[in-house]
Design a protein with these regions (language model features):
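Short, solvent-exposed turn/loop segments enriched in Gly/Ser/Thr/Pro and often Arg
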Residues: 1-4, 165-167
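A contiguous, low-structure linker/loop signature
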Residues: 2-44, 57, 64-65
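Active-site loop segments of alpha/beta catalytic cores
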Residues: 21-24, 42-270
Length: 270
């Protein structure tokens, strides 16, 4: 996922590369005064219109499987605007300023998700990896409460919010669940058979094949064994959905991706 699109709309400088996903250069906010002056941008800024058009075209042309959009979460966006290390300090030294920034980020993400819903996609995967740096209590206060607001505003029977937090090692799952999202997506650093115990049976738990050591650097044989091992552990949970633990990196061999789906099909036919 491109987690710079929303930051660019706020005015952040973005570096592009043929070998990696776009990245924010520096940070566009330095203090509480900058936060106070920060204007929530319109959806005409940066690459937002291009992404909305892409989602519209995908929803119209892909009809044999669900189509989901992507967006960043409020805490992760705030970190890209203010600098992640500085934000970790701000939430303790000046929580009011942090909440002001998070509120502005949330307002923009809500507008963006509402526009994504209008394209006809079936939902949005909200990437909030930076919230995994926080304790469960801080995650709820500075991330999940804001995500909950967005979920309440945009989620419906035909538009699901999937909350992704690959920074969660199992320590902030309860905070994630407090958002009320329809599905929760986990990274490879947690144990799926443990975190799913905190997930309501009415919500999906998704994950968590290692995107680097298995998808990119592994072999089809390793992929097959890893998928079978995970599915064995999760066989008693009908709300589990097999997935990668995060974005698959550039240059991931297509043979490994094919092996992922083939292993799933073969396991289900046993």
């Amino acid at each position: 996922m491109d987690l710079t699109t929303e930051a660019e709309a706020f005015g952040a400088e973005i570096a592009f590369s043929d070998e990696a996903v776009p990245a924010v250069v520096g940070h566009c906010l330095s203090n509480a005064d900058d936060i106070d002056k920060l204007v929530v941008p319109s959806l005409s800024q940066g690459r937002i219109p291009a992404y909305l058009k892409a989602n519209l075209l995908a929803a119209r042309s892909i009809t044999d499987r669900p189509v989901f959009a992507g967006c960043i979460g409020p805490y992760s966006l705030a970190g890209r605007l203010y600098d992640m290390s500085e934000l970790m300090v701000l939430i303790y030294e000046n929580p009011d300023a942090a909440h002001q920034l998070l509120s502005k980020c949330t307002m923009f993400i809500k507008k963006y998700c509402q526009a994504l819903r209008q394209t006809g996609v079936g939902g949005v995967m909200m990437a909030e990896p930076a919230a995994g740096l926080l304790s469960d209590g801080d995650c709820k206060t500075f991330s999940s409460d804001y995500v909950r607001y967005i979920v309440d505003e945009v989620q419906s029977d035909d538009f699901l919010v999937i909350l992704h937090n690959c920074g969660n090692t199992g320590h902030c799952t309860k905070a994630m669940v407090s958002t009320g999202a329809a599905a929760y997506h986990f990274g490879n650093k947690c144990q799926m058979e443990e975190v799913i115990r905190d997930i309501p049976p009415t919500a999906l738990a998704m994950g968590n094949i290692d995107p680097v050591s298995v998808f990119k650097d592994g072999t089809p044989a390793l992929m097959r064994q890893t998928v079978f091992n995970l599915l064995d552990k999760m066989k008693d949970y009908p709300n589990f959905v097999l997935s990668s633990g995060c974005d698959t990196p550039p240059h991931t061999p297509s043979a490994n991706v094919d092996a992922f789906f083939e292993a799933l099909d073969d396991y289900n036919q046993q």
